[in-house]
C-alpha cells in the first residue's frame, strides 16, 4: 500500500474574507474585498457601512469557528490554512498601534486549533488589504505601504510566535497581473508599469516579512504562495513552444524573485522592451535577498498557449486568457481538469528551486444537491480529489519534497471571483445560498467521510 511521508500535513485552506463575516465587528476596518461584494475581480464600488453584501456574514466563521474546527478535527486534519484579515489588526492600515480586539480573535482561533492538535498555516494577505490604504495612499502603488505591511507582519509574528510556526506572505501573488485591485489595490485600467511597480513594492514587503519572521520566529518557516498556472503549448510549432516558455515565466518570475533573491534576466529584458522603468533602490535589492523557506501554491487547472493571435483573441474572455486543451474535460465553471498536470507542476517547481513545496489549494467547485434525507452525494468531488492526490503521491515518488496538502474550501465558503455560495468546494455543507438565505447549519457530505479515510490511512486508501 503506497502512503505519504509520515510527517505529511493534511488539511484544508480558507481565507478570512470568504469565511469570517463580522466584517465591521470588534473594530475591523473595511477591506478591498468588503467594497466588492459581488465579485472581487470586478469594478470597485465603494460601499456604505450597513449595506448588505454576502461576505458581511459569509459563513460566520468568526462566531462559529469552534464548531468548524471540531468538524475539521473529526476528519483528522493536522493542518488548517487560514488568513489574518489585515484590517482586523490595523483597521485603516496606517495606525501606530494595533487593534487589540482583532489580535484577541486570532489568539482564540489558534488556541482552538491547538486543542485539536491542528497546525496553523497562516497567510498574511489573502486577496484583501485595508480599503483606507487604497483610498488614501493608492494601494501598493505607494512605497509607503511597504512599511505599513512590515509593521503589520512584525505585530502578528510577535503576538503569535509561540502559536504559529508556518506563515505565507501574499496569496497567489502572481494574480496581480490579472486582477490588479484584488492583488495590489490598483484599478483594472492601470498601466503595466504601474502594476509592476506595485508588484515590486509587494515583493520587497514579502522579503521584509521573511526577514522579520526569521528574526522573531527563529524556529518558524515562511513561504510564498503562487497560483500554479502551468501552461502547455497547443502544438509542437517552435513559435508555440517559445510562447509557452514566456507565459510560464510570467508567473515563475514571482517565485524566482522570492526564492532566488533577485530579478531574473528575462524580466529585466521584458521591462526594457516594454519601456517599463521601475523605481528599484539599492535598499530594495538588499531586502530581496531574504528568500522564503518553502514554496506554496494553488492548483486548479492547466491551459494551452499558442502564438496564433486569432486563437488568443478567443481565449481572452477567461481571467488567465488560456486556450482550452482539447484533450481535457472541464468543470461546471469551465476549469479544465488535469490531475497529471499537478504531478508535472510539482516536478517543475522542485527542479527549478530545490525548496520544499506545499500544495495549499486544490479542489473542485461544483453545485451540490441536498437529497430528501439530507445527504449530499458528491462523488464527482471524491473522484477529482482522488485522482489529483494519486498524482501527488507519484510526484513524491519522483523525489519531490512535499510538506503537505490543504484542499481549498474544506467547508463551503463564498467564492472569491463571483461572491457565490453555489460554487461549493467543501466536505462540509453550509446552508446558505447566493442571496444570503439559509440557516448556516453545517452538515457532512459524502466526501467528508472519504477524506477522513484518506487522512487516517495517510493516503493508503486512494484508488489508482
Curated annotation (Swiss-Prot):
Pfam families (alphabetical): Glyco_hydro_1
Query: Per its UniProt record, what SUPFAM superfamilies does this chain match?
Result: (Trans)glycosidases (SSF51445)
**Listed GO cellular component terms?**
cytosol
InterPro entries linked to this entry? Glyco_hydro_1, Glyco_hydro_1_AS, Glyco_hydro_1_N_CS, Glycoside_hydrolase_SF
Q: What is this protein called?
A: Phospho-cellobiase
The enzyme's main class, written as a single word, is: hydrolase
Q: Which PANTHER family match?
A: 6-PHOSPHO-BETA-GLUCOSIDASE ASCB-RELATED, GLYCOSYL HYDROLASE
* Gene Ontology BP, a term: carbohydrate catabolic process
Q: Which family does it belong to?
A: Belongs to the glycosyl hydrolase 1 family.
Superkingdom assignment? Bacteria
Keywords on record? Glycosidase, Hydrolase
- Catalytic site: 172, 361
Q: Which organism is it from?
A: Klebsiella oxytoca
In alphabetical order, the GO MF annotations are: beta-glucosidase activity
EC number(s) on file: 3.2.1.-
